[in-house]
A protein has these predicted regions:
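Short, surface-exposed patches at the edges or C-terminal ends of soluble domains, predominantly
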Residues: 1-183
Length: 183
């Protein structure tokens, strides 16, 4: 009998906010926490695959949403699954096609502890955020709910209803989802 073993290294990424990035700016820790809770976590290599997964009830987390075309954002908004936007760039069209909320550059220092000040169950479960490097404005979006205010009409986290009826959640600053924050 012969036993052959092959030592391999796990494939990891250095891409910021990637679920397979174990470095400070990665989100491997949050992916592992979700898996521990029984939630399947995977990455889609195309918008069409993400839209298909959304049609099948998956929640889609989007980083760098500003790199999607307006048509791609609209397709996600219509697909039927919940969408979570992780990180927005102030003044960009990151949210266009998904909601009437707009991304803003207003921020609060990391030393500031933000309280939810809304009834959203996820925000209440989080209890607080340590500052925010970005925000969203609800101006022009009458049914959106802002949480963790960083200033007048500026929120670190907000929710809205997508055209499909599913939920949109926006975490303006991706920092709280990173390995550095969860370590």
């Amino acid at each position: 009998p012969v036993l052959v073993t092959l030592w391999t290294r796990p494939i990891t990424s250095k891409t910021p906010l990637a679920i397979d990035n174990p470095e400070k700016l990665g989100t491997m820790a949050v992916a592992e926490l979700l898996r521990h809770e029984g939630i399947s976590v995977s990455k889609a290599d195309s918008v069409s695959k993400a839209v298909e997964a959304s049609r099948n009830g998956a929640t889609i987390a989007v980083v760098n949403a500003d790199r999607l075309s307006l048509a791609e954002r609209k397709a996600l908004a219509q697909a039927g699954g919940d969408v979570v936007i992780v990180g927005v760039r102030g003044g960009s069209d990151t949210l266009k096609g998904l909601t009437d909320m707009t991304s803003k550059g207003a921020a609060s220092p990391g030393s500031t502890i933000l309280e939810p000040q809304c009834g959203d169950a996820d925000a209440q479960a989080a209890r607080s955020l340590a500052g925010s490097h970005a925000s969203v404005s609800l101006q022009g979006d009458d049914d959106a709910v802002g949480c963790f205010p960083v200033g007048e009409d500026r929120y670190a986290y907000a929710t809205d209803t997508l055209p499909s009826g599913a939920a949109l959640r926006v975490l303006a600053d991706p920092g709280p989802a990173t390995n550095a924050h969860l370590a």
